[in-house]
């Protein structure tokens, strides 16, 4: 997406992701090779998660690293940052049992939000995306209902959720400013609309 500049025009990405100084990535998992004399939290061989661009080697302050539990698959651990981002929606929305939650956008952060909503005990975890592959993953992750459509084209179906009241929480994970008006229209009266990620 970034390499081929496939992001919405006139967004802050154009300023951030300019070539050739671009360093890709925002999070990494790594194995500690050496430590400084004042580091007591880690030792060589430990696996860590860090908010840092991709690279073969990094010099990091210990305070900017998080331990990965021994035995955890690093392919799973690399999702920690996205899970934390999605957790912000669960925290802000106060996800809890009995709620009716709509997630617009089933990309990586959306997939994590689906899992937070499902594990919270929500009665409905509805997901809107135009990708059948993403919606298949959404079902595996706990979505109770999926809409393979643009949000603008399925508002009537969404508003029929929760006995016609609509979703109590709408999480827009698309990063597309044009979706916001539809997210507002989809929410139940006095419902919450959460923008998660960049727009």
Regions flagged by a language model, labelled:
Residues 47, 100, 191-193:
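Short glycine-centered segments of the SAM/dcSAM-binding site in methyltransferase folds
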Residues 34, 129, 197:
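Conserved acidic E/D residue at the C-terminus of a beta-strand in Rossmann-like folds
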């Amino acid at each position: 997406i970034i390499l081929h500049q496939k992001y919405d025009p006139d967004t802050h990405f154009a300023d951030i992701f300019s070539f050739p100084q671009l360093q890709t990535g925002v999070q990494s998992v790594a194995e500690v090779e050496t430590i400084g004399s004042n580091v007591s939290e880690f030792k060589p061989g430990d696996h860590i998660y860090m908010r840092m661009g991709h690279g073969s080697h990094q010099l990091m302050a210990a305070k900017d690293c998080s331990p990965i539990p021994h035995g955890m698959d690093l392919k799973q651990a690399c999702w920690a940052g996205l899970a934390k981002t999605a957790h912000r929606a669960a925290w802000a929305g106060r996800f809890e049992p009995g709620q009716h939650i709509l997630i617009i956008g089933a990309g990586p952060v959306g997939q994590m939000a689906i899992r937070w909503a499902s594990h919270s005990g929500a009665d409905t975890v509805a997901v809107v995306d135009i990708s059948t592959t993403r919606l298949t993953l959404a079902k595996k992750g706990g979505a109770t209902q999926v809409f393979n459509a643009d949000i603008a084209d399925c508002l009537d179906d969404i508003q029929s959720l929760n006995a016609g009241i609509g979703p109590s929480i709408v999480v827009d994970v698309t990063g597309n400013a044009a979706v916001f008006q539809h997210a507002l229209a989809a929410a139940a009266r006095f419902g919450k609309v959460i923008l998660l990620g960049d727009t």
